[in-house]
């Protein structure tokens, strides 16, 4: 659909419904915790700008960011691999992807992301890390070898809103001279 009005309207409807759901959940783990629309748009723009071909998303939830990535992937000829530990949320994400006709560029993987990362030999030119923050540093052990050396990008969500929880990951990346890092207030 490439960011057509019907696509954007449906994304907005989904986002609003996810926000309402989250407001009813006392336990943080039960919330969908999708990224903000501005962040999602930034991700889609980044994929288009760098003409990404292999995209990895760690933390599908209900697929809000996945939909944005998949729309951009259709434009660039990319494939999105998205990881989610919760099968029910993956089924929701698949439903929305089919509804919005972007499912043809998405591979859904259900299970612990750590297992996927340990086994994967793939290189990705765009990686979105938006999962349980206490696992980020462990994931970095594998992600640093999965980022395409020529122009690959890793986007880490919650760097500002949960700075203390991701500080060790950010410090680890900053110490590695193979990578550059910056924080964007989106």
Model-inferred region functions:
Residues 1-126, 133-155, 159-186:
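A short alpha-helical cap/connector motif
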């Amino acid at each position: 659909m490439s960011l057509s009005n019907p696509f954007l309207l449906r994304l907005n409807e989904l986002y609003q419904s996810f926000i309402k759901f989250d407001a009813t959940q006392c336990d943080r783990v039960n919330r969908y915790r999708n990224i903000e629309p501005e962040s999602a748009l930034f991700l889609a723009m980044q994929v288009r700008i760098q003409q990404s071909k292999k995209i990895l998303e760690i933390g599908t939830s209900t697929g809000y960011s996945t939909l944005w990535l998949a729309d951009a992937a259709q434009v660039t000829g990319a494939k999105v691999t998205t990881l989610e530990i919760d099968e029910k949320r993956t089924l929701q994400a698949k439903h929305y992807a089919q509804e919005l006709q972007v499912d043809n560029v998405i591979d859904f993987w259900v299970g612990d992301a750590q297992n996927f990362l340990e086994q994967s030999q793939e290189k990705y030119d765009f990686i979105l890390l938006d999962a349980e923050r206490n696992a980020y540093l462990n994931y970095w052990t594998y992600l640093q070898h999965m980022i395409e050396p020529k122009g690959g990008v890793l986007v880490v969500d919650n760097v500002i809103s949960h700075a203390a929880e991701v500080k060790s990951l950010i410090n680890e990346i900053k110490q590695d001279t193979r990578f550059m890092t910056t924080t964007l207030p989106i």
